């Protein structure tokens, strides 16, 4: 067997392996999400403002990525509860979820990793107003913080510690 044939066979194996590694790496890290934004502008679900009650609210602070805006929990006219983000902005990323965390605050990754949490689902957008429905069994006395959490990399993009409405007016 000559050297030319062995090199040719080697490249027939190496090139597909490189292509597969690039595709898997792109899928895992999703580098395009670092430079793209997903804007949302969801309307508030309440029809009758007089029947809407603020239960809790808090301001986002940055974690591993700049994060800003307000998180407010409302009880709306049908009795359901809604978590609403207003003036919200954070970085985009792969597999970013919204968590309700059983902690007073979540300033680092460990404070989310070592606490109980409820996953409200994938983030709807990294910029803009958005709503998340809260289950009727979610104990707001226990779950005191909203976290923007990247499941893929275990990173807390930012968090909003919540205060009861009675404390907000003081």
Describe each PLM feature range.
Residues 158-170:
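C-terminal end-helix/capping segment
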Residues 29-78, 112-118:
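Transition segment at domain starts
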Residues 12-27:
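Hydrophobic membrane-insertion alpha-helices, especially the h-region
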Residues 135-159:
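Short, exposed beta-strand-loop hairpins at the edges of beta-sheets
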Residues 97-99:
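Beta-strand signatures of extracellular beta-sandwich domains
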Residues 108-136:
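An anionic, turn-rich surface loop/hairpin at beta-sheet edges
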Residues 68-95:
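Short, surface-exposed binding/anchoring microloops in extracellular/periplasmic proteins
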Residues 1-9:
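N-terminal Lys/Arg-rich, disordered targeting/topogenic segments
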